[in-house]
Amino acid sequence: MQSNAISDNSSPWYLRPERGSEWGLRFMMLFYRLCGKFLTRVLLYPVVTFFFLTDRAGRRLSREFFERIYQHSGSSGSCSVLSHPPGVWDDFQRFYNFGCSMVDRIEVWGGTSWTTNVTWHGLQHFDCLQEQDGAVLMSAHIGNLDALRVASKTKTEKEIKALVFTKNSDHFMKVLNIVNPDALKDVVPIQNIDILTMLKLKNLIDEGNALGLVADRVTEGSPERVIEVPFLGDLAPFPQGPWILASLLGCPVYTIFCVRAERNRYDVFIEPFADKITLPGKQRETKLHDWICSYALNLEKYCCRFPHHWFNFYDFWSRSSKTSRRV
């Protein structure tokens, strides 16, 4: 893999190129196929160490994130595994867990038999989901949603379609297409949310699919459509788009997270969020703020519980008065 060192991690995530190259991802996939998961995870240590040592800004931002978790957990009484002041091992473990999630993605997308054990939390809500015509599953860049989509196939016939912003993941999408083109059939690639995209998504919901999307990052097409809400002790910008989208689709909304608890086990957490997202005319901005606040509070809970699986490696709290709005 090559080192595209990122000099300014305060830039929006969509302006930052992927670290690593297409051939590097190809090599990891080939190594996985030839040597298996165990040896691939062993290989991860020198690979992750290289990226960890060469990304000074990433290490700094990781430490700032853990400091937020540590301070917030102490002041709010939130449940957190971080009962000690954060150190280098916490930072490295977060980088390594991200590498492990990539290995799991290779296994999931490769079409091989996925043998990882899954523990479901709130499975009764998932059972209810099966009875509905369609739903939106709101998640975030914590854990591994690709693993979730495969695990869900053992529990329901309902298809989970992943809404994926492809521009920043161009290398990985190319490799996936080569390794297993069928793996992309459950992916809905987008650049921007426009009328044609909305019609396509509405059809998927009407056909009874569940639409999975992340609601923690601002999209490239609308960086100004942001609302700041409290998150881990400070105001953080969250996109309006997912909530406007959910209101237009007019279906039930759930929050869902899939986090690797051990080497061969994942925990899936699903909770009902709203029967329907409503944004009435004059109260539109206030309601948007309320929905995003509720989501951020829910996300905060999982960040405190699984801080080493938070995979936003940029300044999440960076904001500008010109591009974000306080309501």
Name each model-derived stretch.
Residues 2-139, 175-179, 184:
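Membrane-anchoring hydrophobic helices of lipid-metabolizing enzymes
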Residues 15, 49-50, 113, 136, ...:
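Short, contiguous strand/loop micro-motifs
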Residues 39, 144, 310-311:
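Short hydrophobic/aromatic residue motifs in ordered secondary structure
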Residues 81-83, 87-100, 133-192, 207, ...:
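Catalytic core of membrane glycerolipid acyltransferases/transacylases, capturing the structured
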Residues 116-120, 142, 169, 191-195, ...:
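A conditional alpha-helix N-cap/helix-loop micro-motif detector
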Residues 121, 188, 271:
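General small-molecule cofactor/ligand-binding pocket signal
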Residues 154, 178, 182, 195-327:
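Non-catalytic C-terminal accessory region of glycerolipid acyltransferases
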